[in-house]
Amino acid sequence: MKGKPAVLAQLHKLLRGELAARDQYFIHSRMYQDWGLEKLYSRIDHEMQDETAHASLLIERILFLEETPDLSQQDPIRVGKTVPEMLQYDLDYEYEVIANLKEAMAVCEQEQDYQSRDLLLKILADTEEDHAYWLEKQLGLIEKIGLQNYLQSQMS
């Protein structure tokens, strides 16, 4: 089924974001592992796998709409140097993804591509209710209990 150009443009934009988020989570997870913060490593590695799954869903949809996904393009990533900075960069990225998903869903509605919209709604729910929410909680914990206590709680 041939997709509408406006919808495909949005799907490609989202794919670039998911690939970048995956890579940002990848480097951050390995940094946490290197620092001995095993709980953070495990959670952020899980987030990386979720972003890979989101990218896979977008790739499958783009292919269904008879276009070839471009995996050579992705948005820039921001690598933090401290745990709070890394968590904040990841949260900022999730907020950007949320805004892009909502924009893309509006385009899907306008173009009457309800299947793409429904797919994006599932990704949005995961992004808002899991990824962004968890990151907000971690930054809140750092404020409440202090960075040193937080870091100690993230060791295995």
From Swiss-Prot:
An MF annotation (GO) of this entry: ferric iron binding
GO cellular component: cytosol
Cited PROSITE patterns: BACTERIOFERRITIN, FERRITIN_LIKE
Any Pfam family matching the protein: Ferritin
EC class name: oxidoreductase
Regions crossing the membrane: none
Entry binding sites for Fe cation 2: 51, 94, 128, 131
Gene disruption phenotype: No visible growth phenotype in iron-sufficient conditions (30 uM Fe(NO(3)3)), in low iron conditions (no more than 36 nM) cells grow at half the rate of wild-type. A double bfrA-bfrB deletion grows as well as the single gene deletions. Even in iron-sufficient media both single and double gene deletions have lower photosystem I content (PSI, which contains 12 Fe atoms), store about 50% wild-type levels of iron, and undergo iron-stress.
Induction cue: Constitutively expressed during growth in the presence and absence of iron (at protein level). Constitutively transcribed in the presence and absence of iron.
Function in brief: Part of the iron-storage bacterioferritin (BFR) complex which stores about 50% of intracellular iron. Iron-storage protein, whose ferroxidase center binds Fe(2+), oxidizes it using dioxygen to Fe(3+), and participates in the subsequent Fe(3+) oxide mineral core formation within the central cavity of the BFR protein shell. BFR rapidly binds iron in labeling experiments in vivo during iron-limiting conditions.
Assembly description: The bacterioferritin (BFR) complex is formed of 24 subunits (BfrA and BfrB) of unknown stoichiometry. The BFR is arranged as 12 dimers that are packed together to form an approximately spherical molecule with a central cavity, in which large amounts of iron can be deposited.
Name of the protein in question: Bacterial ferritin
